[in-house]
Amino acid sequence: QQAVEMAASQRLCILTGGPGTGKTFTTRTIVALWKAMGKSIALASPTGRAAQRLSEVTGKEATTIHRLLEFDPSKMRFKRDSDDPLPVDAVVVDEASMLDLFLAHSLLKAIPPTAQLLLVGDTDQLPSVGAGNVLGDLIDSSQVPVLRLTQVFRQAKASQIVQNAYAINQGNYPALESVSESPETDCLWLGAPEPEDGVRSIEAIVQELMPALGFDPVKAV
C-alpha cells in the first residue's frame, strides 16, 4: 500500500528489494492504478528479455528503452528528447540497476516535466555495462523517495534460488545440490573437473537438456 501511494503521488520514486520481496506484484498494482486513473503509461527496460518479462507480468506492452526513445542508428542518437518528449503521463523502468549514465540521461530528457517515473530494480543484481551506477547512486543520495521491500514471501522462501541469492549476498556459501542426485529443487549444481569439461556440459544443457524440458535456450538463458 505504501509503494502504491508513493507512486501515485511522487514524480520520481524508486522501488527496490531482493528476489521474492514482491517487486513484480507491486509494479503490476501500480500500473493497474495508473491505468484506472486514465494515465498514458510507457513500460520499458534496458534489455529485450527484461522488457518481455515486464510485459508478461503487467499485461501491457513493454519495450526496450532504446526503442521507446526511438534510437536512430544513422545519426546515433535518440529521436525523443526534451524538444520532442514522450507522449505519456507515466513511465515504468524495470531492471533499473542496468541503467548507465548515458541511457539514464537520455531517458530523463525525454520524459515530460509533468510525467511520473518509477524505477524498479535491485542494486545487488546485474549492474550497467556502461559507466555509472545510476540506481545505487540515486538510492544513496537520499534525494529520491525510495521504498525498499524486505519481506520475502512464503512462496519465494521455498525457492532454493532465492535462498542461495540471499546467502551469497550475506557472504555465505550457497546450498548446491548435484544434478546427478536429481533432487526436487529449482537450483542444481553441475560440477566439472576441468574448464573444458564445463564448456561441454554447458553445450549439452543448452542443446539437449533445455529443449527436452520445453525451454527455449535463446529466450530462457
What are these regions (language model features)?
Residues 40-45, 49-110, 151-152, 161-162, ...:
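Conserved P-loop NTPase motor core of helicases/translocases
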Residues 101-115, 133-138:
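Short, conserved "post-DEAD/DEAH" coupling segment immediately C-terminal to helicase motif II
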Residues 26, 30:
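Hydrophobic positions on the alpha1 helix immediately C-terminal to the Walker A/P-loop
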Residues 20:
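Walker A (P-loop) phosphate-binding loop of P-loop NTPases
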